[in-house]
């Protein structure tokens, strides 16, 4: 009669001893190191995810208008973005990333997109503010 498969819930120290785990210490150590490395990477990615879930742009009314806004206090956001991009690059360089590479690459793309959007937004905002001043000048309005 065949024994039922061992499940995590029923796995015991006796099962390890019966498998002669002491003969496989090197392999067990490799697996443990890989799992620990993956856990560190996943922890980093989770911290980044949580940070971006709660991060907001700071916007203010442009001059005394009620319907025109601009982004302000961008330095903290840029610092956070650069820090997270470096952390993701560090994760990508880890030897433990192989099995979770797709998740890390996804965050690399997301952060790259955020960076591109912020850069374009700031270029547009600077141009808009410049043109706003020109077209609202007294001699142009008349």
Predicted segments — roles?
Residues 1-142:
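Extended amphipathic alpha-helical elements
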């Amino acid at each position: 009669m065949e024994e039922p498969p061992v499940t995590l819930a029923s796995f015991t120290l006796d099962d390890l001893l019966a498998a002669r785990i002491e003969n496989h210490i090197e392999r067990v150590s490799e697996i443990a190191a890989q799992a620990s490395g993956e856990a560190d990477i996943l922890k980093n990615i989770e911290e980044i995810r949580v940070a971006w879930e709660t991060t907001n742009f700071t916007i203010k009314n442009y001059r005394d208008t009620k319907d025109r806004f601009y982004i302000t206090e961008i330095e903290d956001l840029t610092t956070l973005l650069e820090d997270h991009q470096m952390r993701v690059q560090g994760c990508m360089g880890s030897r433990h990333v192989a099995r979770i590479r797709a998740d890390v690459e996804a965050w690399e793309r997301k952060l790259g997109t955020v960076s591109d959007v912020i850069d374009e937004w700031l270029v547009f905002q600077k141009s808009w503010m410049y043109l706003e001043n020109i077209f609202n000048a007294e001699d142009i309005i008349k």
